[in-house]
Amino acid sequence: MKIVLSKIHWTLITAIYMLGILWSSLQPEVHQKHDVVRETVHNGLHVPAYMMLTFLLVRTFQSYKNTKLRIALWAFIISASWGWINEIVQSYVPGRTCSLSDEVLNIIGTGLSLILIKKIKWLTGGKGK
């Protein structure tokens, strides 16, 4: 089933999602006992969060009839930049830090999303690899 949304819909959905990521970055860390499992899950969520952001950015740029290369480049640049902006913002939140490893996970999620989109042929318009 193909979802057909207008430019404004994709833009709004993407902006709201980006604000959700920012909101989650602004939440102070509650002082809890060091728990490796909780931290691993929390850090692992960076990958799917940025995979979804990249997917939304791709769909937004597709709605504006951009070229495939331009779509992929801008989606990567914006997603990776948003991750870095969020890491910097986090450094000002009590109990939170700016983490290079989190940004690496954000970039991994971004890259995986672009690879999956290409493999699933959303980005290529059904023409394959």
Give, region by region, the residue ranges found by the protein language model.
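"…centered on the first transmembrane helix and the immediately adjacent amphipathic helix/loop
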Residues: 1-59, 75
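Short helix-capping/hinge motifs at transmembrane helix termini and TM-loop junctions
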Residues: 27-28, 62, 94, 121
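Interfacial helix-loop-helix junctions of multi-pass membrane proteins
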Residues: 33-39, 83-107
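Membrane-helix interface segments
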Residues: 6-10, 31, 64-74, 96-100
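Membrane-embedded catalytic cores of phosphoryl/pyrophosphoryl-handling enzymes
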Residues: 57-64, 69-90
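Membrane-interfacial alpha-helical segments at the cytosolic side of multi-pass membrane proteins
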Residues: 49-64, 110-121
